[in-house]
């Protein structure tokens, strides 16, 4: 993957250190998913080659430690150490040597304990990693060899249908499959090295509606199970411009609902998502958003408007250079049995479906990847990607954990519309058959 000129990174090279810390997370995401080296970033790109200063590299290394990117932390501290080799500042050199030693110790500790850099409750945003320890003695230890073998088996097992295998493995092993075992495939899908299958089927959606028979929607089926497809011409260029213009002045740093070590719902893991967000309802921006909602309803036959809880407000998001979101899910099956879950029954029930409207084209990066389904989808302005978050029996469809790959060139804008489950009972009824999935958007074929 080609990373474009360093000067496009808003945090580099003319900025204060607080901006470096803010931009470092996106930079680390780009490195993880594109395999670009610290040296390439340090020395700069393009005709106007402007590199990084030592203190900037130290701050990036610290950010890598905080986010669990221990291998990159070591690499950035080593890069800073090499860059300062000619310096006469002995205190700086001693400090860098200490940082390198501490980062290596942390890195090796995780590898020897787990065989990989662990995704856990303490570091929810940790990137997986299965490299060898820096300590030569630890590389040959029986403990590390045992855990490394387990990791390789985990990756091999994750290449199967993890959703179907969920009942045959422990909960802990299942989540390791989702977040750790699938990471090598996820990275390839983000890079475009592994191409997803082309559209399985293209069709006109009209649902025997008299109006749509004259002007049907174009629909591309990109995955049959779990069902996912693209509806074309949901948003028009002038509408997109208006929504983006209105949203720009109200964007805030995104947080993400997650769980703490006690299993309670909490938010604030902002390091898992590097983006800006605002929310808009059809009432607050009626002209374009009401039109989008109406078109989505006509194309999908989902109920978005009959009650206040039929769907959520539009989530308008902007991902700049390096903007990404790590693997997550849009709904949760806890809500199906536990009404206490704050985002579930008290607010209209679980999210049955996600409708992601693309507002801009991203020249490089920015794919939406479903590693469990082997699917990567690139942006298409004005079109909407639709997928089911839960199966027709009410259980979570694990293959729809997805990742927003880092933007490596350009700017990514999307508008998410989450559709609540209870309001869809008449049009997309429940199934009594355990494990059955919803089909695509053809009402003559509701289940698969």
Q: What are these language model-derived features?
A:
Residues 1-384, 390-448:
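Fe(II)/2-oxoglutarate oxygenase catalytic core
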């Amino acid at each position: 993957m080609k990373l474009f000129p360093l000067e496009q990174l808003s945090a580099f090279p003319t900025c204060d250190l607080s901006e470096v810390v803010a931009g470092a997370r996106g930079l680390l995401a780009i490195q993880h998913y594109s395999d670009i080296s610290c040296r390439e970033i340090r020395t700069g790109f393009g005709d106007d080659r402007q590199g990084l200063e030592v203190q900037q590299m130290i701050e990036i290394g610290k950010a890598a430690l905080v986010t669990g990117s221990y291998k990159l932390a070591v690499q950035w501290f080593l890069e800073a150490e090499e860059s300062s080799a000619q310096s006469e500042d002995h205190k700086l050199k001693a400090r860098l040597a200490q940082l390198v030693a501490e980062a290596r110790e942390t890195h090796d500790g995780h590898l020897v304990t787990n065989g990989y850099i662990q995704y856990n409750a303490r570091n929810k945003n940790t990137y997986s990693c299965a490299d060898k320890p820096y300590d030569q003695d630890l590389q040959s230890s029986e403990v590390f060899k045992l855990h490394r073998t387990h990791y390789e088996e985990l990756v091999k097992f994750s290449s199967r249908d993890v959703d179907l295998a969920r009942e045959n493995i422990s909960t802990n092993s299942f989540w390791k499959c989702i977040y750790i075992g699938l990471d090598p495939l996820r990275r390839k899908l983000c890079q475009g090295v592994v191409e997803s299958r082309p559209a399985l089927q293209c069709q006109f959606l009209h649902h025997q509606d008299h109006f749509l028979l004259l002007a049907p929607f174009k629909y591309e089926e990109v995955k049959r199970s779990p069902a996912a497809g693209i509806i074309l011409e949901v948003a028009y260029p002038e509408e997109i411009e208006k929504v983006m213009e209105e949203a720009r002045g109200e964007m805030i740093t995104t947080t993400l609902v997650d769980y703490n070590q006690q299993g309670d719902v909490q938010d604030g893991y902002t390091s898992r998502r590097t983006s800006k967000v605002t929310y808009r309802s059809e009432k607050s921006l009626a002209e374009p958003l009401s039109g989008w909602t109406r078109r989505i309803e006509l194309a999908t036959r989902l109920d978005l408007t009959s009650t206040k809880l039929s769907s959520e407000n539009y989530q308008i998001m902007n991902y700049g250079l390096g903007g990404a979101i790590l693997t997550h899910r849009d709904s949760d099956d806890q809500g199906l049995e536990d009404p206490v879950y704050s985002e579930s029954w008290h607010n209209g029930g679980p999210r049955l479906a996600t409708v992601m409207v693309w507002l801009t084209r991203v020249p490089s990066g920015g794919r939406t990847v479903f590693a469990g389904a082997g699917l990567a989808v690139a942006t298409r302005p004005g079109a909407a990607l639709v997928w089911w978050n839960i199966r027709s029996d009410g259980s979570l469809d694990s293959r729809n954990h997805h990742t927003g790959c880092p933007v490596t060139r350009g700017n990514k804008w999307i508008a998410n519309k989450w559709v609540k489950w209870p309001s869809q009972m008449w049009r997309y009824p429940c199934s009594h058959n355990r494990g059955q999935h919803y089909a695509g958007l053809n009402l003559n074929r509701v289940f698969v």
